[in-house]
């Protein structure tokens, strides 16, 4: 991976105008060797050039702040198998992504309304055509013909004292779904892969959080709901997956004398649908930690128990064409950890920029 990024800003018309560019080049080899010959060994290569240009203008008025931006992305994707260029799976994408936001203060309430168009590109493992052996009934592979997901998002947010609120409505095009298809006539073998969903998927999310400070206690309570509108084909009938799911988290820290800090974090999520998966039970966890600092916080020792009630277990159903998967996962995440940390050099970095190629690193 090679990446470079440049941003220039200047005053213009009472506001600030910024232009920039980011270029990344990625070369990835993906070799899968199966000596038992359950599936054929395969050797693939991906080369991707991503060139981006963007411009943004910000200006403040007595009645509010405006921000306007436009981003252009050019992506050249080349796919190779056994060092041979595969033309039908190599593509070029050119997209424009605008964004606009307006923020103002209504009394004591700070509000913002924003519209953003953005993309989520598939991970490189999702783009690999190598076939992986899961078990005697299941094979798995990526899909080099995947298109990037395009998201149009409209968000209204507000803040008052220690309360924050967010309402969001989005339309997602070409969402990448995990999908299963039967390989042979007797339905004994299934190929799991990824596919783009051709129809646009609406989604609504709402979150409310509170972050007060009460003496030595700093609680953070957050509740939210997410609902999608999605109907998939399932054994030649339509399966509607529009069940909303609710989440809640309650994180707490207590700063005590003598450098002690106690943390108590909890999370819970209800049953509900996300993409073509339905989680059919509520799950969550509780974590507890105690931290002691020494030497003006240069040295710290932390004792932490994760999932102390052993409740982080999920079960879900996946609906995809002629394939149905029910999976129950009981992760062994109940653990006790001891962390000793010493800060050798606490001087702040003078570097003021942002990292180039961060989105590409996340796709690796």
List each language-model region with its residue ranges.
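Conserved C-terminal beta-signal and adjacent last beta-strands/turns
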Residues: 100, 241-364
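Transmembrane beta-strands of outer-membrane beta-barrel proteins
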Residues: 17-21, 66-70, 98, 111-113, ...
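Outer-membrane beta-barrel signature, preferentially recognizing the C-terminal barrel domain
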Residues: 45-48, 88-91, 119-173, 191-204, ...
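Outer membrane beta-barrel strand-and-loop segments of large Gram-negative receptors
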Residues: 1-7, 42-46, 50, 147, ...
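Outer-membrane beta-barrel translocator domains and adjoining extracellular loop/strand segments
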Residues: 29-38, 78-86, 124-132, 137-138, ...
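Transmembrane beta-strands of outer-membrane beta-barrel pores
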Residues: 12, 23-29, 59-63, 72-78, ...
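Face-selective signature of the C-terminal outer-membrane beta-barrel domain
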Residues: 1-82, 105, 109-110, 163-165, ...
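Residues on the lipid-exposed face of transmembrane beta-strands in outer-membrane beta-barrel proteins
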Residues: 4-10, 53-59, 100-104, 154-160, ...
């Amino acid at each position: 991976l090679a990446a470079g990024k440049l941003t220039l800003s200047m005053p213009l018309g009472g506001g600030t105008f910024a232009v920039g560019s980011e270029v990344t080049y990625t070369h990835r080899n993906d070799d899968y060797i199966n000596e038992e010959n359950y599936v054929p060994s395969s050797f693939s290569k991906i080369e991707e050039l991503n060139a981006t240009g963007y411009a943004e203008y910000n200006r403040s008025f007595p009645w509010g702040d405006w921000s306007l931006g436009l981003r252009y992305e050019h992506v050249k994707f080349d796919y190779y198998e056994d060092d041979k260029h595969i033309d039908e799976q190599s593509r070029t994408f050119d997209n424009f992504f605008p964004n606009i936001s307006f923020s103002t203060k209504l009394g004591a309430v700070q509000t913002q309304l924003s519209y953003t168009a953005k993309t989520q590109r598939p991970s490189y493992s999702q783009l690999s055509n190598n076939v992986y052996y899961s078990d005697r009934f299941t094979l798995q592979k990526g899909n080099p013909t995947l298109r990037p997901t395009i998201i149009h998002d409209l968000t209204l947010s507000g803040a008052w004292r220690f309360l924050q609120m967010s309402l969001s409505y989005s339309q997602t095009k070409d969402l990448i779904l995990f999908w299963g298809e039967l390989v042979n006539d007797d339905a004994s073998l299934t190929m799991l892969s990824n596919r783009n969903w051709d129809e646009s998927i609406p989604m609504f999310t709402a979150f409310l959080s509170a972050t007060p400070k009460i003496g030595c206690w700093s609680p953070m309570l957050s509740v939210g709901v997410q609902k999608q509108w999605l109907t998939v084909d399932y054994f030649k009938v339509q399966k509607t997956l529009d069940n909303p799911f609710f989440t809640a988290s309650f994180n707490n820290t207590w700063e005590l004398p003598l450098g002690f800090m106690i943390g108590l974090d909890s999370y819970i999520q209800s049953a509900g649908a996300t993409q073509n998966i339905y989680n059919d039970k509520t799950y969550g966890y509780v974590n507890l930690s105690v931290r002691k600092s020494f030497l003006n916080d240069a040295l710290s020792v932390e004792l932490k128990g994760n999932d102390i009630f052993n409740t982080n277990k999920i079960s879900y159903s996946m609906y995809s064409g002629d394939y149905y998967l029910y999976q129950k996962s009981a992760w062994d995440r109940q653990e006790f950890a001891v962390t000793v940390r010493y800060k050798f050099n606490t001087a702040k970095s003078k570097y003021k920029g942002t990292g180039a190629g961060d989105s590409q690193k996340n796709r690796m």
